[in-house]
Amino acid sequence: MSEEKIMSELHSTISLPEAQTVNGKTVLYCHERREWRAWLEGHFESEREVWFVFPSVASGEVGVSYNDAVEEALCFGWIDGQAGTLDEMHQLRRFTPRRKGSPYSQPNIERLILLDKEGLIHPKVRANSEVEKAITTPFTFPEDILTAIRADEKAWENYQNFSDSYKRIRVAYIDAARKRPEEYKKRLKNFIDKTRDNKRIMGYGGVEKYYL
């Protein structure tokens, strides 16, 4: 099937929306966040995966942002994973139901906290004990990371004025690299340097929304 025909068929289903099979993948293209939510509402318990389409800026097409797509997925117990390419103007991201026992990343925990406050999490998902735990369990700041920040007087002064959510996200990002010592040191140094200058780090995929 040609790329032109693929996109034509995908666009023709926007109003419902319905997924199409493209090169063996179940692909979904939505113009608006509410369409993605509607699809999840009808399929989150029955489907096992979908490849969501993100148009490039150069395409001139309207699509759902990565962050909005992830938020809606979390509302229905799904998470994002592998990235792919549909064509030169359209990227793909695989969304699947979250595996039981799979840990939530700190950005996703922050998303869940906000979504819970807004009452957007599906009742069946909100009733899950793992979701409850993710939302309500206090974050533990590793003492060695705090000690490293305290060692820089100006950085520590500025650090204390940052929001709790920002500190959780950035410290968790540093901590996640512990098994890669060089990367861990790089992340910690970058955070301390930025904090000394009283600058926040802009994260991936719109995570700064949660730097409340």
Regions found by a protein language model. Name each.
Residues 2-212:
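Charge-dense, helix-prone N-terminal extensions
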